């Protein structure tokens, strides 16, 4: 596997990995995986964890009551288990002096642009200050999200959210096989997939674990999402010795899915998808130079005028003094807010608005230059 010197990695742990073949959370397996993630951080990599297991943790905490099929029962177990799961993770990562932060998401949070910006800013700030984010779906309030494969899909969306180079989905299955290895002894592991297509989906079948909600089919769906967004994805067995460290070191473990586009191309398409027409931010010559020649973010000081209306999180054009559109980007502030802070210093934003979403009106990572 090609390696960057330092990577941003999303690790997804399924319920089957957390239980390690038992009917409860398996602490030795969890502490070993925590050790590996801590080791990756020590090597300079950034790690985000997407974890299943809240429902199981709740079931364990309540003394393993008889399982019921009602959605509300699952949600109640998730509500009980989420705090317990985070408490366990907090204790395990404390062994390696790794601070953790809990984030509960649904895919709806990542479809709405304002909530997307908020989630992205929170997670990137956590990474910046050395905190390991632990993400789970908000099962206690979600309705149609508690279904097969949701955390697989969520992990791919999170990888895109934080611009991860690598997504690793750990399971009780070692990867994608030519046939179901539990029923066909001649099945062989496929170590590399160039593109997710109908043949790959056919190989996935409906294989899955009874303890979790995800099967191989949903992992292939996640692979399609991740690779289209420019992220390499690997499916591997969670009980494989030192699996995370070996993967990041470049060893071939499990099944690798190659990205079919660059992360930059994918993000540009996403940013441009909802550009607000007949609206723009006019900037001065100094801002033009900072944006086009120095790769800077757009700050209030360089803004001279606001045209049109938009909401926070929408894509707006940036126009030079000669009227030429030089870039587009996700705006951290609504049009009426930009109108109030234009020409101001970043340190004055909070005193002008009474709050602040950050120093940048449009961050360079959320900008497409022309």
Swiss-Prot record:
The terms describing its cellular component in GO are: cytosol
Q: Where does substrate bind?
A: 52, 139, 151
Read off the Pfam families from this record.
Answer: AA_kinase (PF00696), PUA (PF01472)
* Catalytic activity from the UniProt record: L-glutamate + ATP = L-glutamyl 5-phosphate + ADP
**Which Enzyme Commission number(s) are listed?**
2.7.2.11
- Gene3D superfamilies tied to this protein: Acetylglutamate kinase-like, PUA domain
Q: Which residues form the PUA domain?
A: 278-356
Q: Name one GO molecular function term.
A: ATP binding
A single GO BP: L-proline biosynthetic process
Functional description taken from the UniProt entry: Catalyzes the transfer of a phosphate group to glutamate to form L-glutamate 5-phosphate.
Q: Known PANTHER family for this protein?
A: GLUTAMATE 5-KINASE, ISOPENTENYL PHOSPHATE KINASE
Question: Which family does the entry's similarity section mention?
Answer: Belongs to the glutamate 5-kinase family.
Q: What is this protein called in UniProt?
A: Glutamate 5-kinase
Organism of origin: Herpetosiphon aurantiacus (strain ATCC 23779 / DSM 785 / 114-95)
């Amino acid at each position: 596997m090609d390696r960057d010197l330092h990577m941003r990695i999303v690790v997804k742990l399924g319920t089957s990995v957390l239980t390690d073949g038992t009917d409860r959370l398996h602490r030795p397996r969890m502490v070993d995986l925590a050790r590996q993630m801590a080791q990756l951080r020590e090597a300079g990599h950034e790690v985000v964890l997407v974890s299943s297991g809240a429902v199981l943790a709740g079931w364990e905490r309540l003394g393993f009551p008889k399982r019921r099929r009602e959605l509300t029962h699952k949600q109640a177990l998730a509500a009980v288990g989420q705090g317990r799961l985070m408490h366990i993770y907090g204790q395990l990562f404390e062994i390696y002096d790794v601070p953790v932060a809990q984030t509960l998401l649904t895919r709806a949070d990542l479809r709405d642009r304002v909530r997307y910006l908020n989630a992205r800013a929170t997670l990137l700030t956590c990474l910046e200050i050395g905190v390991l984010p632990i993400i789970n779906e908000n099962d206690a309030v979600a309705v149609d999200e508690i279904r097969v494969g949701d955390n697989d899909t969520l992990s791919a969306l999170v990888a895109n959210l934080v611009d991860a180079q690598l997504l690793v989905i750990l399971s009780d299955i070692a990867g994608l096989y030519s046939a179901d290895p539990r029923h066909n002894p001649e099945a062989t592991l496929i170590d590399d997939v160039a593109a997710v297509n109908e043949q790959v989906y056919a190989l996935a079948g409906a294989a899955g674990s009874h303890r979790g909600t995800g099967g191989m089919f949903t992992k292939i769906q996640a692979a399609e999402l991740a690779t289209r967004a420019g992220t390499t994805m690997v499916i591997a067995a969670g009980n494989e010795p030192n699996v995370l460290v070996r993967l990041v070191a470049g060893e071939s473990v499990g099944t690798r899915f190659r990205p079919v586009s660059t992360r930059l191309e994918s993000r540009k398409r996403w940013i441009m998808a909802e550009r607000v027409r007949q609206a723009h931010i006019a900037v001065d010559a100094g801002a033009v130079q900072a944006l086009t020649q120095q790769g800077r973010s757009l700050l209030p000081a360089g803004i001279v005028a606001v045209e049109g209306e938009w909401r926070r999180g929408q894509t707006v054009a940036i126009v030079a003094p000669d009227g030429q559109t030089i870039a587009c980007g996700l705006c951290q502030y609504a049009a009426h807010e930009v109108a109030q802070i234009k020409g101001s210093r970043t340190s004055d934003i909070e005193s002008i608005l009474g709050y602040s979403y950050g120093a940048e009106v449009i961050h360079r990572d959320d900008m497409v230059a022309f």
